[in-house]
From Swiss-Prot:
Top class in the EC scheme: ligase
Manner of cofactor binding, per the entry note: Binds 1 Mg(2+) ion per subunit.
Any single Gene Ontology cellular-component annotation: cytoplasm
The organism's place on the tree of life at top rank: Bacteria
Binding-site residues for GTP, renumbered to this chain: 12-18, 40-42, 304, 330-332, 412-414
Annotated family: Belongs to the adenylosuccinate synthetase family.
Binding annotation for IMP: D13, E14, G15, K16, N38, A39, G40, H41, T128, R142, Q223, T238, R302
Protein name: Adenylosuccinate synthetase
Annotated organism of origin: Bacillus cytotoxicus (strain DSM 22905 / CIP 110041 / 391-98 / NVH 391-98)
Length: 429
């Protein structure tokens, strides 16, 4: 039995898709366990760039099973768009499996997400407005509609009628907005369900059978630890658990079956949306990192906020996700910067903090304590081993591993999967 979890250690956009794609080569099953189409990942496969939001990165390998787990929330309309996107490019999706227990995002979730953000004004969370939060709210309130319901004409109609009676009252009374017609949503989305029915099954059985047979299973996290609803910078977080512990809940696989956890981070930090960001850069270096690193959201297109590498954040991720291995991406983006900095602690009211404070008012006032290292000017995009890196770049990578306390397993010097280099094999093969 060999299972590996890939999680983001920052605020998402760390390059998890590329690392998952890279690790997929030796995996036999690839599964997502939380989130929805609010997560965007860019994958370069055979020289072609693909942008996915729902479907696991392993979809490009026909012989590998790809799983959308029960912990995800699925917009059937968005899923069908993504399936067509792949089919139009000659990519088969016969290897896709969708949990019959995954919850469904419906039009009223999208509308509620948008209206609530507008209502909050300056206090908005900065959601992607994909209906993720409202769908998870309904799940917690036990009124959600699952894939199994979507495929059952009678059950879907009954639950939709009940939910819309409440949702339409909410739209009219709280937001002064029009509600939805039950029949229109029912006919449209029941048809969507029929189009994806071939993929729907009990994915917990699929995953556990694979593990019991000794097959290699890769679990692909979305977003990042700092966006985790429990361990992140709450309330500026997503509505699910990207931490490694989310695998057991979101896939139906027991914790004893998780063997390795790879934490993915960039050589700097980025963030989309609102919330505290201690190492954020507002100067020319920040702009340089944004442009060279192409720091614009895959899902939203919004410019990402960027800053220096924060070892306090990644140490937090190591602790709450039990990270066993580190994957450091985008080292090449820092090339040409004379002095590079790593945040080693925070300072608040004269006190040095080694951990991320839960109180966001405190976090917002924290000043980063930096360690400065000499930069490098050499082109490193063709480097194939740690030893080939220029001395200053190699020292930077080693220092990140030391400060975070996570052994380095791989590092990347560019966006293509061929620019990802293995230091040690996470599958133990």
């Amino acid at each position: 039995m060999s299972s590996v979890v890939v999680v983001g250690t920052q605020w998402g956009d760390e390059g998890k898709g590329k690392i998952t794609d890279f690790l997929s080569e030796h995996a036999e099953v690839v599964a997502r366990y939380q989130g929805g189409n609010n997560a965007g990942h860019t994958i370069v496969f055979n020289g072609v760039k693909y942008k996915l939001h729902l479907i696991p990165s392993g979809i490009f390998y026909k012989e590998k099973i790809c799983v959308i787990g029960n912990g995800m929330v699925v917009d059937p309309k968005a899923l069908l768009v993504e399936l067509k996107y792949l089919h139009d490019r000659g990519v088969s999706t016969d290897n896709l499996r969708i949990s019959n227990r995954a919850h469904v995002i419906l039009p009223y979730h999208l509308k509620q997400d948008e209206l609530e953000e507008e209502r909050k004004g300056d206090n908005k969370i900065g959601t992607t407005k994909k209906g993720i939060g409202p769908a998870y709210m309904d799940k917690a309130a036990r009124i959600g509609i699952r894939m199994a319901d979507l495929l059952d004409r009678e059950a879907f109609k009954e639950k939709l009628e009940r939910n819309l009676a409440e949702k339409n009252r909410l739209f009219e009374k709280m937001y002064d907005a029009e509600g939805f017609n039950v029949d229109e949503i029912f006919e449209e989305y029941y048809e969507y369900g029929q189009q994806i029915a071939q993929y729907v099954c009990d994915t917990s059985v699929v995953l556990n059978d694979a593990l019991d047979e000794g097959r290699r299973v890769l679990f692909e996290g979305a977003q990042g630890v700092m966006l985790d609803i429990d361990q992140g910078t709450y309330p500026f977080v997503t509505s699910s658990n990207p931490v490694a512990g989310g695998v057991t809940i979101g896939s139906g696989v027991g914790p004893s079956k998780i063997k390795r956890v790879v934490g993915v981070c960039k050589a700097y930090t980025s963030r989309v949306g609102d919330g505290p960001f201690p190492t954020e850069l507002h100067d020319e270096i920040g702009q340089q990192i944004r442009e060279v690193g192409r720091e614009y959201g895959t899902t939203t297109g919004r410019p990402r906020r960027v800053g220096w590498f924060d070892s306090v954040v990644v140490r937090h991720a190591r602790r709450v996700s039990g990270l066993t291995d580190l994957s450091l991406n985008s080292i090449d983006v820092l090339t040409g910067i004379p002095t590079v900095k790593i945040c080693v602690a925070y300072k608040y009211n004269g006190e040095v903090l080694d951990e991320v404070p839960a109180n966001l008012n405190i976090l917002a006032k924290c000043e980063p304590v930096y360690e400065e290292l000499p930069g490098w000017t050499e082109d490193i995009t063709g480097v194939k081993s740690l030893e080939e890196l220029p001395e200053n770049a190699r020292h930077y990578v080693e220092r990140v591993s030391q400060l975070t306390g996570i052994p380095l397993a791989m590092f990347s010097v560019g966006p293509d999967r061929s620019q990802t280099n293995i230091v040690r094999n996470v599958y133990g093969i």
